[in-house]
Structures are given as C-alpha cells and as structure tokens.
C-alpha cells in the first residue's frame, strides 16, 4: 500500500496559516479539497496535481462542504461568514452570507434536497434553500429559510457540528452545551 502526499508543500515549518483545517472529497471526481487557514486547495489525486485554489478572503476557514453535484462549495469561517463558490465561475466566492453574529463552526449540504445549513457560536443554525440550475448561464439561487435556536452558548461556544439525514429533511446539531438536537420540518 502506498500513501499519496499531493499537499506536501501546503505546510511550511512554524506557520499556522498553512496548517490544514478541514478536508473533503469531491462526490464524483478523484479530487480532494484541503482547507488551510486562508485558502482551499483542490487536488487531483490521480494526477497528483493542484487543480485550483479558492480564495475566500477570510481570516480563518473553519468548515467546508461540497455540493452533491460537485460544482459548488460552501465554507464557513471564524469571522462569521458563509461563502458559496461556483467552481465553474471563479476562484472567488459567488456569494457571501453574513447572517451569523459569531464564528461559524460547521456547514453542510443535504445529500439530495436543495438545502444547506450553517452552525455558529451564536447558538443558532441557519437553514438555506439552494437551487442549482443545470443551465450554466443561470446562477445558483440562495434563500435563507429558517433560524433554529435551542442550543445554549457555553464558554463562548455554540453549535459545533451538523449532520443531515440521507434522504429526509432532518437535521441534527451538536452543541457545546452537551445537547444533540433533531430538527424536523
């Protein structure tokens, strides 16, 4: 067995800006998304080459998820932003959502429904409707749907993790208060 190291150069000695924050696979291609503090690098694991670098312009990336189609990426940051990237359009965000009042800890796409969610240290979970069109000339439509409140903020930490049900519109959130909450429509 052999291990690949396509991101050997992402870390320089003593620099936290290059330390890996989170990783995610592309749903259909042999691509790996590697988020460092300020950038998201997309590597082709077969070619062992850098495909592109996303430049969100945030201070610190906290979380990342790839749309089931593989053409879109959302990321959360500790400076309260959720950003949507269209991989076919640009390396800069298509849309920046600034609805949270504290650091964003988690973002997640629903595997089959046009939904995504973000969780933050303000103790809230924001749910969005995201319509992705097959027409390449039409941009994605992002609509905030609901703010879910229920987690208590503990020592400046709120909601830490999110998970969608594979087929139903059910969302589970885990908070620093020690609770896991199931959200249903």
Predicted regions and their residues:
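WD40/WD-repeat beta-propeller blade N-cap
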Residues: 6, 13-20, 55-61, 97-104, ...
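Loop/turn segments within WD40 beta-propeller blades
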Residues: 23-29, 65-70, 108-113, 163-168
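Short coil turn/linker residues within repeat-based beta-strand modules
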Residues: 4, 47-49, 89-91, 132-134, ...
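Conserved strand-to-loop turn within each blade of WD40 beta-propeller repeats
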Residues: 35-37, 76-79, 119-122, 174-177
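Blade-level signature of beta-propeller repeat domains, shared across WD40, Kelch, NHL, RCC1
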Residues: 160-185
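WD40-repeat beta-propellers
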Residues: 1, 40-44, 82-86, 107, ...
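A structural motif specific to WD40 beta-propellers
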Residues: 7-10, 51-52, 92-95, 136-138, ...
């Amino acid at each position: 067995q052999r291990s690949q190291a396509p991101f050997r150069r992402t870390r320089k000695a003593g620099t936290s800006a290059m330390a890996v924050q989170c990783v995610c696979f592309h749903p259909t291609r042999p691509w790996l998304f590697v988020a460092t503090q300020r950038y998201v690098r997309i590597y082709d694991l077969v070619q062992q080459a850098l495909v592109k670098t996303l430049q969100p312009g945030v201070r610190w990336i906290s979380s990342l998820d790839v749309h089931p189609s593989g053409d879109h990426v959302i990321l959360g940051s500790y400076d309260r932003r959720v950003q949507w990237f269209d991989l076919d359009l640009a390396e800069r965000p298509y849309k920046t959502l600034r609805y949270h009042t504290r650091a964003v800890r988690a973002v997640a796409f629903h595997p089959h429904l046009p939904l995504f969610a973000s969780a933050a240290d303000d103790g809230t979970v924001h749910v969005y409707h995201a319509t992705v069109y097959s027409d390449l000339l039409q941009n994605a439509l992002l609509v905030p749907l609901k703010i879910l409140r229920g987690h208590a903020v503990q020592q400046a930490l709120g909601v830490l993790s999110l998970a969608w049900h594979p087929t139903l519109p059910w969302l589970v959130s885990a908070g620093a208060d020690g609770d896991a909450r199931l959200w249903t429509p």
